[in-house]
């Protein structure tokens, strides 16, 4: 790491690596500007005004599954924490599980395949290790199998990882699910008992690139946005009326303070 006329250094990667770079002797000695985009435990909140019969319920499920599987979950904006009303926890879990069961994994050039491999075998090992860490405080809903069906020729040795959904029953009393990011097709369900608790859980991510709120009531959005805006690069509000034009939870928006081509 050289001075290079004190040009800023930007880093995108894990929080552990970012912490090491931040205290690099040359960076500190020469006061080189350093910016890191590290782990982001992004969340999506299903508001408690939404019931399983509402369109918004299906929109939430669709967003979570899409963010888990697009690019095999290797996105800094992917939904890592799915915050849902405890009264609808079972319904949410079953719907997400059903959708994930239809995701065909393998060679993306083969028709019908919906999800490909991770970037490398080392990344595969890292995701497996982090899922194991998460499972110390969360139970497995689906996935997590090292031996699962793949489609395509020559894929057996690929860095594939089965879409994995976890459930943390007591997220208010658990740190790991808010701190550990498995950078792959992995998300954790977190039940809440009221909207105050939902917002508190969202803030446990210690600042995220993006958060989503799925609600059918403008008043709920008006309550949540001022409370969470400072903790997120952007807030994505979704209901049945906006769904047709929505760019989705993980779509970069270059005109905002976060996101754009070449960025998250």
Feature map (PLM): residue ranges:
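Periplasmic-binding protein-like
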Residues: 8-12
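Alpha-helix/helix-capping structural signal
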Residues: 15-16, 87, 219, 241
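Short, small-residue-biased leader/transition segments that mark boundaries at the very start
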Residues: 2-7
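Conserved C-terminal structural/oligomerization subdomain of aldehyde/semialdehyde dehydrogenase
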Residues: 1, 104, 153-264
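ALDH superfamily catalytic-core signature
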Residues: 16-173, 196, 200
């Amino acid at each position: 790491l050289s001075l290079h006329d004190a040009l800023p250094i930007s880093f995108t990667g894990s929080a552990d690596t970012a912490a090491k770079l931040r205290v690099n002797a040359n960076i500190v000695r020469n006061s080189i500007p350093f910016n890191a985009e590290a782990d982001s435990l992004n969340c999506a909140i299903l508001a408690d005004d939404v019931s399983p019969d509402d369109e918004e319920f299906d929109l939430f499920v669709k967003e979570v599954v899409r963010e888990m599987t697009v690019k095999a979950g290797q996105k800094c904006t992917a939904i890592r924490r799915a915050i849902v009303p405890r009264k609808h926890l079972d319904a949410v879990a079953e719907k997400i599980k059903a959708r994930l069961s239809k995701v065909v994994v393998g060679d993306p050039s083969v028709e019908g395949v919906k999800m490909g491999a991770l970037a490398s075998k080392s990344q595969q090992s890292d995701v497996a290790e982090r899922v194991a860490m998460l499972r110390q405080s969360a139970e497995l809903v689906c996935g997590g199998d090292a031996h699962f069906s793949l489609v395509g020729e020559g894929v057996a040795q690929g860095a594939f990882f089965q879409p994995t959904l976890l459930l943390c029953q007591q997220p208010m009393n658990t740190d790991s699910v808010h701190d550990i990011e498995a950078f792959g097709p992995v998300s954790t369900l977190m039940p809440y008992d009221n909207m105050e608790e939902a917002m508190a859980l969202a803030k446990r991510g210690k600042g995220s690139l993006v958060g989503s709120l799925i609600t059918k009531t403008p008043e709920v959005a008006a309550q949540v946005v001022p409370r969470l805006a400072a903790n997120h690069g952007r807030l994505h509000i979704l209901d049945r009326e906006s769904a047709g034009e929505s760019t989705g939870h993980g779509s970069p928006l270059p005109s905002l303070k976060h996101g754009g081509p070449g960025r998250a």
